[in-house]
Amino acid sequence: MGNGWHEWPLVIFTVLGQCVVGALIVSGIGWFAAKNDADRQRIVRGMFFLWLLMGVGFIASVMHLGSPLRAFNSLNRIGASGLSNEIAAGSIFFAVGGLWWLVAVIGKMPQALGKLWLLFSMALGVIFVWMMTCVYQIDTVPTWHNGYTTLAFFLTVLLSGPILAAAILRAARVTFNTTPFAIISVLALIACAGVIVLQGLSLASIHSSVQQASALVPDYASLQVWRVVLLCAGLGCWLCPLIRRREPHVAGLILGLILILGGEMIGRVLFYGLHMTVGMAIAG
């Protein structure tokens, strides 16, 4: 699948991180809408899986860096380095959101403080995804230095996060209308298809003296088709019951999540496979 497979730790880190951010926002809205403490507590217990996935993502990122010490060293240039900003933003999001979950799950969270804390965690998640996109806005890598990168990362949030949250809320047996979020995911899929087409067309005009962007991943078109098929199948696991006015089963939602994550990981592998440099970067 092109040259992007060697960046599999980053594929896992970015996709899972973006999925968790989207799921925290939607499940958090469900938590706000819960009618009693028992419902809220069941939602909080289900949110354990968000922080489990976030932990897996961070373990993958450490594997990419080689050792935990390098992760600490990479924080030396916060404010000046995109990588430092990303790791700092992700660590703060993980710490603040994870601590909210821990205090909430043991039942020690005052409701007013819990609402403010959760809202703050959601905002930190959005900042984390934004910092992720900034890492790849490198002017000497024209295949990444564009709006498609930013769109792709935030579309992953909208594609994978809501269905994970829907599974958590359904497993918690909470009455909550997830249809608006399913519609948002469908709109994100349409936008994703548009990005795929436009970016594919733009590759023909990107080249260096030794490389042509369109030749970096020969199977780009066919793999993107498979990606869209997986995304459609995954969303179908959520949409079909809703169209029939039935509640989706947790197993169906989990299957849909797996299919969507698989599709987004294919897209992210292609993203890393499109890496190419033009000119020289000058450190500031």
Swiss-Prot record:
Q: How does it sit in the membrane?
A: Multi-pass membrane protein
Name of this chain's protein: Anaerobic dimethyl sulfoxide reductase chain YnfH
Its organism's taxonomic lineage begins at: Bacteria, Pseudomonadati, Pseudomonadota, Gammaproteobacteria, Enterobacterales
Q: Which UniProt keywords apply?
A: Cell inner membrane, Cell membrane, Membrane, Oxidoreductase, Transmembrane, Transmembrane helix
Q: Where does the sequence pass through the membrane?
A: 10-30, 46-66, 87-107, 116-136, 149-169, 181-201, 223-243, 251-271
Question: Which species is listed as the source?
Answer: Escherichia coli (strain K12)
Please indicate the ranges of residues that lie on the Periplasmic side.
1-9, 67-86, 137-148, 202-222, 272-284
Instruction: State any GO CC term.
Output: plasma membrane
Sorted alphabetically, the Gene Ontology BP terms of this entry are: anaerobic electron transport chain; anaerobic respiration
Compartmental location: Cell inner membrane
Does the record's keyword annotation contain Cell membrane?
Answer: yes
GO molecular function annotations of the record: dimethyl sulfoxide reductase activity
Similarity remark:
Belongs to the DmsC family.
Function (record text): Terminal reductase during anaerobic growth on various sulfoxide and N-oxide compounds. The C subunit anchors the other two subunits to the membrane and stabilize the catalytic subunits.
Assembly and interactions? The complex consists of three subunits: YnfF, the reductase; YnfG, an electron transfer protein, and YnfH, a membrane anchor protein.
